[in-house]
């Protein structure tokens, strides 16, 4: 039997797998157990009471976290004319049309978010097989296909997170870094949960928020007592 690492032993000793922790206690645990030599991200998994096999129960969208994600986000924008100037002024690193598409086709993808104005989708549509598998394809539901590209760039830079249910009906995303203040992580999580509640499909029955767990990049999941997130519910 393989020996447990020091970190794995610590997690086993500290984390009760059947317990739902007060959000403040959960964050304190993550901070205590974050022993990696880099600043770990704090990730969240939200189990939703939806049937992901039904298209009308897929939950997808985006929300801006009040304290951002702690990541520097590079943004590429497909647009032209005055919108191109506005996107550049808003802070987009890459702006263009066919020439930007050529870069993507050549494998030059030094960006984290792709935004497009509606008139640029004829160009972006050719890149579906490249951008789609990487989760970068612009979509109106996440605010990344929009006539107001400047606002979308600002949102991306401000810490907007995009979310989508996976095949098991679970949302996975990031709510910050482990060196954030506890209240910042709590408020970011509340903002995400609030957005998910608003996005509840009309056809979803029963309990919608089934389980909320937070973890660090290298750590175990800690279940959160939803009653301590009452502000968002």
UniProtKB/Swiss-Prot annotation:
| Swiss-Prot/TrEMBL keywords | Repressor, Ribonucleoprotein, Ribosomal protein, RNA-binding, rRNA-binding, Translation regulation, tRNA-binding
Organism's domain of life?
Bacteria
Q: Which CDD domains match?
A: Ribosomal_L1
- Gene3D superfamilies, alphabetized: 3.30.190.20, 3.40.50.790
* Record-linked InterPro entries: Ribosom_uL1_bac-type, Ribosomal_uL1, Ribosomal_uL1-like, Ribosomal_uL1/biogenesis, Ribosomal_uL1_3-a/b-sand, Ribosomal_uL1_CS
Q: What GO molecular function terms would the record report?
A: rRNA binding; structural constituent of ribosome; tRNA binding
Q: A Gene Ontology CC term for this entry? A: cytosolic large ribosomal subunit
Which Pfam families does UniProt cross-reference here? Ribosomal_L1 (PF00687)
A Gene Ontology biological process annotation? translation
Family matches, as NCBIfam families: rplA_bact
Q: What does this protein do?
A: Binds directly to 23S rRNA. The L1 stalk is quite mobile in the ribosome, and is involved in E site tRNA release. Protein L1 is also a translational repressor protein, it controls the translation of the L11 operon by binding to its mRNA.
Q: What does the subunit section of this Swiss-Prot or TrEMBL entry state?
A: Part of the 50S ribosomal subunit.
The record's family statement is: Belongs to the universal ribosomal protein uL1 family.
Q: What is this protein called?
A: Large ribosomal subunit protein uL1
The record's gene field reads: rplA
